[in-house]
């Protein structure tokens, strides 16, 4: 996949809800998976029998599932969200998620040979960048790293360097002004309401109807309903205007 003898940069766009990954010479992400890590709930001594790993001493049960592996078994798993509201909450699980995306999904055999661009939300604390560096340099041993704001990347991919970006993800919403490629930080507006909060509101509405949702797997089920069934209707259409 090299261009002029130079390997493409690997891009990790990790939000609170989904991880998108791919190469800089591709128009769209090659990987888009839920940003989830699941661990088995050992109810009554049961294990997930459908996920077996063949080892030298016979089959082994897989204790941890990552990304899209989680979906078929979410009702049997305790789910972890490594990033919440744009902030890294669980570095160990984020490492597992990135390692899975790089080695299993992008088929990168040796991470030490790659250069990576990681996106993050604006106004994140310095500790967030420090954690990213620790994971990618110390644990994965990548060759080079650039951490860039998601909003700037959104403008650059359109061929412009000035504008206002409204970025509403799963955990947080930002309105970011950018001038000549520079973020005007003191004018950034942040709202800690986004897709995940809409899911939580939908859960409350369903609970009023008598439905019970208690586990993190239930949350993922309601999010699936929101993304695939729920329709957004303009108020003007509802009142016939």
Task: Map each language-model feature to its residues.
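Phosphate-binding glycine-rich/basic clefts of nucleotide- and phosphate-handling proteins
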Residues: 179-241
């Amino acid at each position: 996949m090299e261009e002029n003898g130079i390997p493409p940069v690997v891009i990790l766009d990790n939000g609170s809800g989904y991880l998108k990954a791919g190469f800089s010479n591709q128009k769209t992400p090659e990987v888009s998976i839920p940003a989830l890590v699941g661990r088995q709930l050992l109810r009554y001594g049961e294990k997930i029998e459908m996920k077996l790993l063949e080892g030298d001493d016979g089959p082994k049960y897989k204790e941890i599932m990552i990304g899209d592996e989680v979906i078929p078994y979410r009702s049997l798993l305790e789910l972890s969200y490594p990033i919440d509201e744009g902030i890294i909450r669980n570095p160990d699980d984020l490492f597992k998620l990135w390692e899975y995306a790089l080695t299993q999904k992008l088929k990168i055999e040796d991470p030490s040979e790659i250069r990576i661009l990681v996106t993050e939300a604006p106004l994140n604390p310095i500790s967030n960048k420090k954690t990213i560096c620790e994971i990618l340099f110390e644990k994965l041993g990548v060759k080079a790293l650039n951490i860039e704001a998601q909003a700037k990347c959104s403008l650059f991919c359109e061929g412009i360097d000035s504008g206002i970006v409204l970025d509403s993800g799963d955990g947080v919403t930002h309105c970011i002004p950018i001038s000549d490629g520079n973020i005007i930080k003191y004018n950034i507006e942040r709202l800690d309401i986004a897709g995940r909060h809409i899911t939580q509101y939908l859960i409350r509405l369903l609970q009023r109807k008598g439905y019970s949702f208690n586990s993190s797997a239930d949350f993922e089920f309601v999010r699936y309903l929101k993304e695939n069934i729920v329709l957004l209707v303009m108020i003007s259409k509802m009142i016939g205007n």
